[in-house]
Amino acid sequence: MCIGKVTSSWRSAASIILACKTTRRVLMLKRGTTAKFMPNTMVFPGGVVDKTDAKLGDEFRIAAVRELFEESGVLSTKNGWQTSANNPDMTSLKADIVNDTSKFEQLSGTICADNLIEWDTFITPANYPRRFLTKFYLMLVDDEPAIDLCTSEMSEYNWIEPKECVDEAYAGKYALPPPQVYELTRLSQVKDWDLCEKYGNVKKPICPQPIKTIGENLITNCFPGDYMYIDENSLQQPLRQMSADRVTVDPTQPTHRATYYSEPMYGKVRLYQHLLKPADIAAFHQFDTHSKDLL
């Protein structure tokens, strides 16, 4: 049974996973309580593409670089990176850019977006009132830059190993949205981060199709390739409701999904990926998930 309305349009957005090869840790930010989208959740730096971003290059890549600078003070440059931490001039410019994104053009001769690795694309489920098509990029660095946090948008930051972040969220320490769990789990299983480019999901976006379990606060997000994923009009599917026996993970069927509890927010996210068809195996990075507990 389908319930609720569908939001047919979305805005373009970009997110960046800042990953240190030496420590194998990534930068995570916690959204503030007043954030319009996913408040009080741990996320990667990122935000909406601005109309001025296209003036400097690929609008998604430029937006990723700009948002990283706005939220963390870390700037991707042609020589690696710079940080506004303990740099009054850069701190002042960062504040100006937060208030007026067009001022990012002042850094056009300094910034570099070509070094970003295209990692994945997620589209917000159709039942959400605010939808985004978000391109995720990976930026690899040799050392962890000092962070100059934008406290008007974020409440805290943390350098943390990907698996540790996922485990702490599962234990209830903080809320971690399913896309972040998906990307961190993938990244944690890449042994050599210098080879990350070969694991990017660049062929097909992931638009989760949510199913609510009747009588429970359990949500199932079906991804492309899952046997319950609806391919026709796949980006505009409304929320469905099903009994527990219908939506329970089947170890004998092609499966690509995330499950979580809506209370507490994004509680105990579990990923499943098994028995995908060849075309979906080619389209999506294959990695270990909770499916190993079933097979």
Curated annotation (Swiss-Prot):
Enzyme class: hydrolase
Molecular function via GO: hydrolase activity, acting on acid anhydrides, in phosphorus-containing anhydrides; metal ion binding
Motif (Nudix box): 52-73
EC number: 3.6.1.-
Entries under CDD domains matching the protein: NUDIX_AcylCoAdiphos_Nudt19 (cd18870)
Keyword Manganese appears in the UniProt entry: yes
Domain of life, source organism: Eukaryota
Coiled-coil annotated residue ranges, if any: none
Stated family: Belongs to the Nudix hydrolase family.
UniProt-recorded name of the protein: Putative nudix hydrolase 7
Organism in which the protein naturally occurs: Caenorhabditis elegans
Lineage, highest ranks first: Eukaryota, Metazoa, Ecdysozoa, Nematoda, Chromadorea
Gene this chain is encoded by: ndx-7
